[in-house]
Swiss-Prot record:
Annotated binding of L-citrulline, by residue: 87, 123, 127, 175, 260, 272
Root EC class: ligase
Protein's name in the database: Argininosuccinate synthase
Keyword ATP-binding: yes
Organism: Rhodococcus opacus (strain B4)
InterPro entries per the UniProt record, alphabetical: Arginosuc_syn_C, Arginosuc_syn_N, Arginosuc_synth, Arginosuc_synth_CS, Arginosuc_synth_type_1_subfam, AS_cat/multimer_dom_body, Rossmann-like_a/b/a_fold
């Protein structure tokens, strides 16, 4: 068997061009591996055939939709993970799964080298190569887009010169990454921060400012932090995401226009659509507010930010991230119950919570007669709680 390069293949411009380029420059055969992560309406058989048309000797499609939902999206839900408090890690959580399957394909197809189509400006180069280093440090890595400073214009020209089938032109230069968890759009006129996104940027969501539909009220049920039913109908994690993508997307929920801090030190503008992700994270977070003890909840919120940063920075397999996984999993033991919410006009409005694990005690919380909270405890508590501040104030004020 000839020496082979196993390429992470998306079906897009950069990786389609990379197949032909790698063959010409290295003389090695290219095996294209495309991972089905629920990429919207994209036909994976078309993607597989496109790789062969571009010159791959083999083209493999891996159906990883349930694996992605159960092992990557679910931990993101349970971590309430929003990088910079906004981005639900649409692309970031898919990269370690792609790395895993690329390594498996390299072992199965005689690959000694793995390749990706990432640029030198983005985060994905780090996510891929740190992942390869964690799972298969013996494999070589090549990154033609980065290492040879391809521009989109050069890539398009190369594709046209070599008759490579692509779905992009200089007039429509968006770079799009999508999976069942969400959709990311960048480049083109979006690079000017003052330019508003046009309607052709969006695909997963309807415009929340026009043609409003009737509000959609629904109930999401969780068991140990895992979504298990919608409106009483049992669902897998994948089915929950898909159903909420449909219903929330129809209400314009999940549109995000973000300027984010990339790992490589630059700021980047991204347009995200993540209707199902945003609904599930919001609902899960609300249920935690009901079921988690205060100090546990406070500490978990600190770990959520760090977990999000680690995943964004490509450290999915790092010891710290793995340790935080264990902590977060422990916190989910009593996160069970129902969250009722309304989707309308791009908004997520929680209006009901119930749980057998609830720490909300009506008799303690009520201000009506018959409450069981003994207010005689309050005066001494306030004095003790503020004592150190009071002592410091006397010193600072010279009293």
């Amino acid at each position: 068997m000839a020496d082979r390069v196993v390429l992470a293949y998306s079906g897009g411009l950069d990786t389609s061009v990379a197949i032909s380029w790698i063959g010409k420059e290295t003389g090695k055969e290219v095996v294209a591996v495309a991972i089905d992560l629920g990429q919207g309406g994209e036909d994976m058989e078309v993607v597989r055939q496109r790789a062969l048309d571009c010159g791959a000797v083999e083209s493999v499609v891996v159906d990883a939709r349930d694996e992605f939902a159960d092992e990557y999206c679910l931990p993101t839900i349970q971590a309430n993970a929003l990088y910079m408090d906004r981005y639900p890690l649409v692309s970031a959580i898919s990269r370690p799964l792609i790395v895993k399957h690329l390594v498996e394909a390299a072992r199965a197809h005689g690959g000694t080298t793995v390749a990706h189509g990432c640029t030198g400006k983005g985060n994905d180069q780090v996510r891929f190569e740190v992942g390869f280093g964690s799972l298969a440090p013996d494999l070589d890595v090549i990154a033609p887009v980065r290492d040879y400073a391809w521009t989109r214009e050069k890539a398009i020209a190369f594709a046209e010169e070599n008759e490579i089938p692509i779905n992009v032109s200089k007039k429509s230069p968006f770079s799009i990454d999508q999976n069942v968890w969400g959709r990311a759009v960048e480049t083109g006129f979006l690079e000017d921060l003052w330019n508003a996104p046009t309607k052709d940027v969006y695909d997963y969501t309807q415009d929340p400012t026009v043609n409003w539909q009737a509000p959609d009220e629904l109930i999401i049920s969780f068991e140990a932090g895992r979504p298990v039913a919608i409106d009483g109908k049992p669902v897998s994690v994948l089915e929950a995401i898909q159903e909420l993508n449909r219903r929330a997307g129809a209400q314009g929920v999940g549109r995000l226009d973000v300027v984010e801090d990339r790992l490589v030190g630059i700021k980047s503008r991204e347009i995200y659509e993540a209707p199902g992700a945003m609904v599930l994270i919001n609902a899960h977070q609300e249920l935690e507010h009901v079921t988690q003890e205060r100090e546990l909840g406070r500490y978990k919120r600190q770990t959520e930010q760090r977990w999000s940063e680690l995943v964004y920075d490509g450290l999915w397999f790092s010891p710290l991230k793995v340790a935080l996984d264990t902590f977060i999993e422990k916190t989910q033991e009593r996160v069970s119950g129902d969250i009722r919410l309304v989707l309308h006009g791009g908004a997520i409005i929680v209006n009901g919570r119930r749980s057998n694990e609830s720490l909300y005690d009506f008799n303690l919380a009520t201000y009506d007669e018959g409450d069981t909270f003994d207010q005689s405890y309050a005066k001494g508590f306030v004095q003790i709680h503020g004592l150190s501040s009071k002592v410091a104030a006397k010193r600072d004020l010279g009293l």
